[in-house]
Amino acid sequence: MKKVGKIIWMVALIAIIVLIGVVGFGYYKKATFTSQNPVATMEVENFGTIKMELYPDQAPEAVANFIKLANNGFYDGTTFHRIVKDFMIQTGSKDGDGKTGAKLSNLKDGGENKDYSIKGEFLANGVTNTIKFEEGTVAMARADYTQYSSNLKEKSYNSACSQFFIMTKENTNLNGYYAAFGKVIEGMDIVHNIENVEVKATEGQENTENAEVSTPVNVPKVTSIRVETFGIDYGMPNTLTPFDYTSWLYKQYGIGQ
């Protein structure tokens, strides 16, 4: 009887030790767990693959927006419509004209077919973002309405939608003024190959002084962009009503629409 009791006591002790070990490991795992940043894979027709690590800790709105658009197929078939050597390559315009972007319906099924924008996540707009604009940095493109009025600074800062650009060279002038949200981790050679395609002056500006020569003659096409989130749901971005520059202009000059 004594022997049986001893065996039962030993089994109970082992069970307690195992339980403590399991619970302890669980707490250790939780304490040391670090989530893996999402990684976007972009396929560019006739060029190759570009992989970009995204940083939700720096620009959560931009990252959530990008993930939804990419994984819903919005970027498939878009083009690198603006290419400036020793500066950046830009894509994400719905019609490839640099003027059009995504709609709310591109973010989710059942969304309205309306334009939208997101908050600019950078220091000048009151958001801490420490990503520097160096070779390979990925950032949201936005409008600059301050050329029309200095009062439109905030409207400019919060005008990003779907267009983004990849830096091909460091440019510190952009630090704190544009929402950087990622970095190329593979395929920087592909980025430079795109950067080096033949370009021409923007349509309508051919004979204009200081016209930007940035429109590719043979436009590089994005086949697809998909983002691996490693099981983490980054949710929906908080969308804003975009600034209607045309209506503002009419109002400024008292012109009826």
What are these regions (language model features)?
Residues 1-257:
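Cyclophilin-like peptidyl-prolyl cis-trans isomerases
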